[in-house]
């Protein structure tokens, strides 16, 4: 799970950020605009460490803290860039993820065009899209220190 995957497009952005306009960078994550935006604003927040999918997250303080930090970064970006919009945050779950590198979708709604909302629906037990807050509840450590 740790480190960088040489074949991963998001790991390439982490290694060589000059190819992408970064909206945020810190020791844990980077953020940039989705190349195929589905909303008025559509940003991605990714960990610098290669974590393939939400299924690789566990009820551990470090995983919970990472996702909470990703959400905080996304919220700050959208509050700054689209404060009047409704915001939505979440992750695709396998097999519906397009890139095998954990990434938080951050939306300032509405979806553009409107039909793109279909891509970001929960499919219940089949997976689909999971809201960031729902994922946080799912991975919250049982004896949380955070």
Swiss-Prot record:
One of its GO terms (biological process) is sulfur compound metabolic process. The adenosine 5'-phosphosulfate phosphorylase activity is enhanced at low pH. The keyword Nucleus does not apply. A motif (Histidine triad motif) lies at residues 101-105. Its EC number is 2.7.7.5, 3.6.2.1. It comes from the Eukaryota. It holds the Pfam family DcpS_C. Its main location: other. Coiled coil: none annotated. It catalyses: sulfate + ADP + H(+) = adenosine 5'-phosphosulfate + phosphate; adenosine 5'-phosphosulfate + H2O = sulfate + AMP + 2 H(+). One of its GO terms (molecular function) is adenylylsulfatase activity. It is found in: Peroxisome. GO terms for cellular component: cytosol; peroxisome. Keywords: Hydrolase, Nucleotide-binding, Nucleotidyltransferase, Peroxisome, Transferase. PROSITE patterns: HIT_2 (PS51084). The active site is at 105 (tele-amp-histidine intermediate). InterPro entries: Histidine_triad_HIT (IPR001310), HIT-like (IPR011146), HIT-like_sf (IPR036265). Homodimer. Possesses adenylylsulfatase activity in vitro, releasing AMP and sulfate from adenylyl sulfate. Also possesses adenosine 5'-phosphosulfate (APS) phosphorylase activity in vitro. Catalyzes the phosphorolysis of APS, leading to ADP and sulfate. This is Bifunctional adenosine 5'-phosphosulfate phosphorylase/adenylylsulfatase HINT4. The lineage of its organism: Eukaryota, Viridiplantae, Streptophyta, Embryophyta, Tracheophyta. The gene is HINT4.
